[in-house]
């Protein structure tokens, strides 16, 4: 069973918005500093890696382990939507590996910024699609 905050569109949307805001703030630090400011950029990227891992991927893991399982059982016909949302999670996981590898090897901050912007765009599209799904099936989920 997934927690009640995941099943309710409004509370779930607030979870997504909060983490998107944290990521945008850390990205502003990375994008705003001179590319030669190694120590500040390094801290910003490490913060972003931790946010992506500890908040976004952990949240995705919980959705897949509980919410998506419950939706699949309670709301027939959602398989294609759930597959697309899970694919978004997979893309974020793969990009996080790329970001972490870039951080630990080359430290090309322009590349890391691009990866973060790509991840954020995927996350925003994912959030919108997930909220649409919850609008369609929220009343069928246990509270």
Name each model feature, range by range.
Residues 1-143:
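Small-residue-biased structural context
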